């Protein structure tokens, strides 16, 4: 086996790389964003590849979009009689091709987590819903936290700050005098709403 891929049934197959399956269950063809999709089995972007793929990429030509397409590389593997296995995702999968998709996926993940506290929550903090607070992080007095929310390690949520819902905050983040919701704040950020 030279590759394994994850497939998922989608409602809008024209927007994805699609796998066409033979009657024996093997992959017949992989097509990137076809105008007339033969199936609704999207290639999810999760691959298990052998070093053989590098040799394929060295011979690959840019697509009509002027990109080297992984689907084209997988198709070359098939055309050269290499074996590609696949597995179907039967539970949740979300394409994260746009910022809106990433925010939505973040919301879904947060909604399925349970609260924990490994940091410090001072007095006079209003907490609503599920909150995951990382090691050495502090939520200061005078803040409002609306879950679901996750706060990484070594972060500080200062007074006069409202955070959440549906927000992921990375490590080493400081939030002060601001209101943030439906967001993903990466590591090492400082957000100060003071003017």
Question: Predicted segment positions?
Answer:
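Conserved core of the sugar-phosphate nucleotidyltransferase
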Residues: 1-60, 64
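Left-handed beta-helix
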Residues: 26, 51-52, 58-195
């Amino acid at each position: 086996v030279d590759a394994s891929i994850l497939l998922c049934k989608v409602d809008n197959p024209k927007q994805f790389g699609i796998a066409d399956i033979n009657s024996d269950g093997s992959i017949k063809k992989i097509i990137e964003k076809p105008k007339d999709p033969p199936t609704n089995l999207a290639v999810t972007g999760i691959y298990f590849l052998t070093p053989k793929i590098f040799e394929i990429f060295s011979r690959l030509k840019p697509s009509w979009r002027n990109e080297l397409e992984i689907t084209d590389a997988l198709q070359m593997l098939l055309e050269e009689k290499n074996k590609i296995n696949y597995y179907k995702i039967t539970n949740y999968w979300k394409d994260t091709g746009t910022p809106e998709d990433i925010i939505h996926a973040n919301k879904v993940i947060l909604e399925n987590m349970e609260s924990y506290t490994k940091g410090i929550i001072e007095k006079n903090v209003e907490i609503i819903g599920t909150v995951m607070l990382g090691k050495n992080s502090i939520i200061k007095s005078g803040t409002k936290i609306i879950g679901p929310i996750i706060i990484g390690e070594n972060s500080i949520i200062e007074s006069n700050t409202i955070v959440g819902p549906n927000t992921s905050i990375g490590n080493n983040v400081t939030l002060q005098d601001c209101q943030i919701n439906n967001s993903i704040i990466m590591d090492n950020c400082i957000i100060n709403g003071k003017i």
